[in-house]
Regions:
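Bacterial N-terminal signal peptides
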Residues: 7-14
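C-terminal subregion of chymotrypsin/trypsin-like serine protease catalytic domains
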Residues: 47, 52-62, 75, 168-178, ...
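Conserved catalytic-core segment of clan PA serine endopeptidases
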Residues: 22-33, 40-43, 66, 72-128
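Sec-dependent signal peptide cleavage junction
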Residues: 15-23
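Polybasic, low-complexity, intrinsically disordered segments
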Residues: 20-21, 263-299
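Chymotrypsin/trypsin-fold serine protease catalytic domain
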Residues: 114-194, 226, 247, 251
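Acidic glycine-/aspartate-rich tracts in secreted/extracellular proteins
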Residues: 63-66, 82-85, 124-129, 155-159, ...
Length: 299
């Protein structure tokens, strides 16, 4: 049986700046916006994660679109939220395709000074019509405290089972460090005492729950420190360190797409009812363009 994503050997962590599914993560079968992304670099299968911020726009990491030589990946496929990566492909449905990629003009993909590790993938048709998540504004970010619930999500490798990917996205807790964040921050380092991303979580969303209960994307996963066997490890401070690319500084790249006016659906043609008379016989005719039968006159 053909399946959406095949099991393959993940190579992301051979790339120095690559992030990683999770150690100590919890599987989420009903998440409405996390997306699994498979593609190829130089013919080699790769896996990343991302988040749907509109019916046709996915935010992910730039290194999930361009390799270290600046070459674009090929054969992109995108999982549908709430669907397992192992669900059979419906041959009667043509899946959305990558239409365009938006990245920062100052993106650096190679060397030691890699930067602006965020990309917005525009699809040629909706991947889903509901359930997507919005990006946190500067006001939202300024309202976060060390007590704010923050979680990372991804389809990457599962530390506990040694699986190279998770069939559904996994959720893991992260601590918010308001000291490391400023209104001009584009990259920040967050920590967790209990969990870390692993290979394949690159581009997965970091999500905060605001005081009003709404979930918003803070940014995307760009990297983890002390990576061994595909997962980050604790530093001397007993914390896992995770590098995040903040999303809001880059929203101008894709606002023109997000703000496009969606044409209203063509209204259904309205049926009209007329009354037709022939002597004492009365008939009511309902149609888009009703006409009285021969011998009848319209009342």
């Amino acid at each position: 049986m053909t399946r959406i994503f095949l099991v393959f050997v993940l190579t992301f962590l051979a790339i120095p700046w690559t992030a990683e599914a999770s150690k100590n993560g919890v599987i989420q079968t009903d998440n409405s916006y996390v997306v699994g992304i498979t593609f190829k670099y130089s013919g080699i299968d790769e896996l990343c994660s991302g988040a749907l911020i509109s019916p046709t726009v996915i935010v992910t990491a730039a290194h999930c679109v361009f390799d270290e030589n600046g070459n674009t990946g090929t054969n992109y496929q995108f999982s549908i939220p709430r669907k397992s990566l192992e669900d059979p492909i419906d041959p009667n449905i043509i899946p959305p395709k990558l239409l365009k990629v938006f990245t920062s003009p100052s993106l650096i993909t190679s060397g030691q000074k890699k930067s602006d590790d965020i990309a917005f993938i525009q699809l040629d048709k909706p991947l889903a019509t509901t359930g997507f998540i919005r990006v946190a504004t500067s006001v939202d970010l300024s309202s976060l405290t060390s007590a704010s619930p923050i979680f990372g999500y991804g389809f990457g490798a599962v530390y506990e089972t040694k699986s190279s990917y998770s069939s559904y996205p996994r959720k893991y807790p992260i601590d918010w460090n308001s000291i490391s964040f400023t209104p001009n921050s584009s990259t920040i380092e967050l920590t967790s005492r209990t969990a870390t991303p692993c290979t394949g979580d690159s581009g997965g969303p970091i999500v905060a729950t605001l005081a009003n209960g709404q979930d918003v994307i803070v940014g995307i996963i760009s990297g983890a420190s002390s990576v061994i066997n595909g997962c980050g490890n604790q530093e001397s401070d007993n914390n896992y360190h995770i590098r995040i690319t903040v999303a809001i500084p880059y929203m101008s790249l894709v606002n023109s797409v997000l703000n496009q006016v969606v044409p209203s659906p063509t209204p259904l043609a309205k049926k009209i009812t007329i009354t037709c008379i022939k002597g004492k016989i009365i008939k009511k005719i309902t149609a888009l363009n009703p006409k009285c039968p021969t011998g009848y006159r319209k009342k």
